[in-house]
């Protein structure tokens, strides 16, 4: 139908009326037997009895009774030219443009009708900020694992996982309508120059997602002591529902002007308490003491670590996720290549500013550092400190053997 209507404007449809001579032929018929060439508008037409004008002294003069030779144009013709196949041919450039338009429109319609999501994760809005579920107490957000969020083994890095946790925490506050002008601060916190700082983080990774996977992150908050708040996360595979990561953290308030810890004011407590969930932590607390290490007990030391401008958050200190990358700077390459990080416990003891210079120390326990290639489970103690020796973060990581995967560019 589309093609017929479009081309009809270029190829006139013959009329069904009959020849007035009664011969039964339709006007506009394509019978080529009686075709005549279309009259030329520039042809000369001679009147009867016309004579060539004589010349006198080289000039033409008219004679009595003579007739002039006149040219007739289509504009002055009293009878229109007969309709023939030749003079009804269209402008081919216009016809080509019409055909192109028809095919483009048909292709677009076909694509719209034929498009079907091949996987459920194709329906994920990558720019959505999630939604509140479970009676308004749990915030849920989906993330698609991007190509720039994976490591050499094709799986998401621990920094990617931690960034997803942080993003859902902030979006939870925003969606609940509690976001002031600060970085996760409520309106009352903003008035009192208060910000949240994390003091403890515990993460257990059962399985790392890979490129293209979609993860579903749930987060909620609970009270922690008199002046703290606990935030938990549960990360699952969006398609299978398999649990991938569990994490729990403790947060306290700090005055951003004095940089000192603060109690939770009653006005702020009134804002956040309606969102507290009365539940146990998603992870049982690892009560083992984090061992302090130094130059003598550390197996690996990395010095001269400095923040980049992009490492700072809006509170003008280094983002807590960045500390994880610095801690792993001193981890042995043998562990990074053959082991996967399965759990991590961090204690944040001091903030780090733009001009800080740090050292990263790692001590390997549970195996001989000379046999990391054949080691099974490995445990490491970590310390991140300033040049003057002040502790920034203490940590413990546990590692297990990676599942063999196919390397890029090799045959399976």
UniProtKB/Swiss-Prot annotation:
Tissue spec. comment: Highly expressed in flowers. Expressed in roots, leaves, stems, siliques and seeds.
Region described as Disordered: spans on this chain: 1-64
Residue ranges with Polar residues bias: 1-19, 27-40
Active site: 315, 317, 352
Reaction(s) the record says it catalyses: hexadecanoyl-[ACP] + H2O = hexadecanoate + holo-[ACP] + H(+)
Classification via CDD domains: 4HBT
pH-activity dependence text: Optimum pH is 9.7.
Entry-linked Pfam families: Acyl-ACP_TE, Acyl-ACP_TE_C, Acyl-thio_N
Documented EC number(s): 3.1.2.-
InterPro entries, A to Z: Acyl-ACP-thioesterase_N (IPR021113), Acyl-ACP_TE_C (IPR049427), Acyl-ACP_thioesterase_NHD (IPR002864), FATA/B (IPR045023), HotDog_dom_sf (IPR029069)
GO molecular function annotation: acyl carrier activity; fatty acyl-[ACP] hydrolase activity
Single GO BP term: fatty acid biosynthetic process
Annotated phenotype, changing residue 315 to A: Loss of activity
Cellular compartments per GO CC: chloroplast; plastid
Transit peptide region: 1-49
Keyword Lipid metabolism applies: yes
Function: Plays an essential role in chain termination during de novo fatty acid synthesis. Possesses high thioesterase activity for palmitoyl-ACP versus other acyl-ACPs. Substrate preference is 16:0 > 18:1 > 18:0 > 16:1. Plays an essential role in the supply of saturated fatty acids necessary for plant growth and seed development. Contributes to 16:0 production particularly in flowers. May be involved in the synthesis of long chain fatty acid.
Membership in a protein family: Belongs to the acyl-ACP thioesterase family.
Record protein name field: Palmitoyl-acyl carrier protein thioesterase, chloroplastic
Organism expressing this protein natively: Arabidopsis thaliana
Primary gene name: FATB
